[in-house]
Amino acid sequence: MKVIKTAPLIPSEIKVLEKEGNRIKISLAPFEFGYAVTLAHPIRRLLLLSSVGYAPVGLKIEGVHHEFDSLRGVTEDVSLFIMNLKNIRFIAKALVGQDSPLENQSVVVDYSFKGPMELRARDLNSEHIEIINPEMLLATINEDAQLNFSLIIYKGMGYVPSEITRELMPEGYMPLDGSFTPIKNVVYEIENVLVEGDPNYEKIIFDIETDGQIDPYKAFLSAVKVMSKQLGVFGEKPIANTEYSGDYAQRDDAKDLSAKIESMNLSARCFNCLDKIGIKYVGELVLMSEEELKGVKNMGKKSYDEIAEKLNDLGYPVGTELSLEQRESLKKRLEKLEDKGGND
């Protein structure tokens, strides 16, 4: 029996069709006619643009002043060395799990190699660095030659040109383009599926391949999460502070964030925990990520849950995503409070 719908069908099926190495095929169904491509295209774009990876963005080689120099005792010149370096895929172990979108996250590693040897990517493995493609050739070092160099590896997403990374480099480092995306390829297909005898429903099949820095299924889930957060601003219950316009510091609810933590009526244990690390204002808590808050010394589960509940009551759940303008405006407001000794 045909019915006139008043709401679209909600997809209920997600299946892993194939999984081999760093490649996966996933199907999602059923979608109303026209919905599949509407969702599949932005998810594909977000996989390519928002997936987080690692890349070298700074290089310092002993005795080298610019990328057109030659390397004494090394077959490859500096340009070829850099090209080979960019083809190596890294994981910076110290940065795994750290998610602070507005702070630079990097690690510096130093290397020294003596010839004769074929320097391959696997030789760069260390307590700080894991190499995904270990057999890549980096350089050929001749007998009696030595190659000393340092790398700055950043965590990031997308592509960042050297004009930008140049501003992050200490003296003596050559800036490199940063190609962070761990996604090698992502395509999708739309197929028709039968639902209760009706063929006018659709299925999305994603084919995702990564370079090994991230599991493809995790990359997919991460992209969906990003999409959900981006769309959250339009929901019936918008995420906190979405009505931002102009100077955030002038908004009425910004006053809540400049209140001292005493106003939250926290237990003595919670208050002491925050006081010991210098947290004075509610806004400082809002600026902290979930990981940062949980990582506070002596912050047990009960204390964390208490703080999370209080922040939620204020309309700022732990991990609330503020825009760059909001964060900067809030930071400036808090700095002014510090300068005034807490009197606003």
UniProtKB/Swiss-Prot annotation:
**Comment on protein domains:** The N-terminal domain is essential for RNAP assembly and basal transcription, whereas the C-terminal domain is involved in interaction with transcriptional regulators and with upstream promoter elements.
Instruction: Report the SMART domains cross-referenced here.
Output: RPOLD
What is the reaction catalyzed? RNA(n) + a ribonucleoside 5'-triphosphate = RNA(n+1) + diphosphate
Q: Which InterPro entries match?
A: DNA-dir_RNA_pol_insert (IPR011262), DNA-dir_RNA_pol_RpoA/D/Rpb3 (IPR011263), DNA-dir_RpoA (IPR011773), RBP11-like (IPR036603), RNAP_asu_C (IPR011260), RNApol_insert_sf (IPR036643)
**Which UniProt keywords are given for this protein, alphabetically ordered?**
DNA-directed RNA polymerase, Nucleotidyltransferase, Transcription, Transferase
The job of this chain, per UniProt, is described as: DNA-dependent RNA polymerase catalyzes the transcription of DNA into RNA using the four ribonucleoside triphosphates as substrates.
Q: What is the top EC class of this enzyme, as a single word?
A: transferase
Keyword Nucleotidyltransferase present in the record's keywords: the answer is yes
A GO CC term assigned to this protein in UniProt: cytoplasm
What EC numbers are recorded for this enzyme? 2.7.7.6
What Gene Ontology terms describe what this protein does at the molecular function level?
A: DNA binding; DNA-directed RNA polymerase activity; protein dimerization activity
Task: Give the protein family.
Answer: Belongs to the RNA polymerase alpha chain family.
Which residue ranges are recorded for the region named Alpha N-terminal domain (alpha-NTD)? 1-238
The cross-references to SUPFAM superfamilies, in alphabetical order and at most eight, read: C-terminal domain of RNA polymerase alpha subunit, Insert subdomain of RNA polymerase alpha subunit, RBP11-like subunits of RNA polymerase
Q: Does the keyword tRNA-binding apply?
A: no
Name-wise, this protein is: DNA-directed RNA polymerase subunit alpha
Describe the protein's quaternary organization and the partners it interacts with.
Answer: Homodimer. The RNAP catalytic core consists of 2 alpha, 1 beta, 1 beta' and 1 omega subunit. When a sigma factor is associated with the core the holoenzyme is formed, which can initiate transcription.
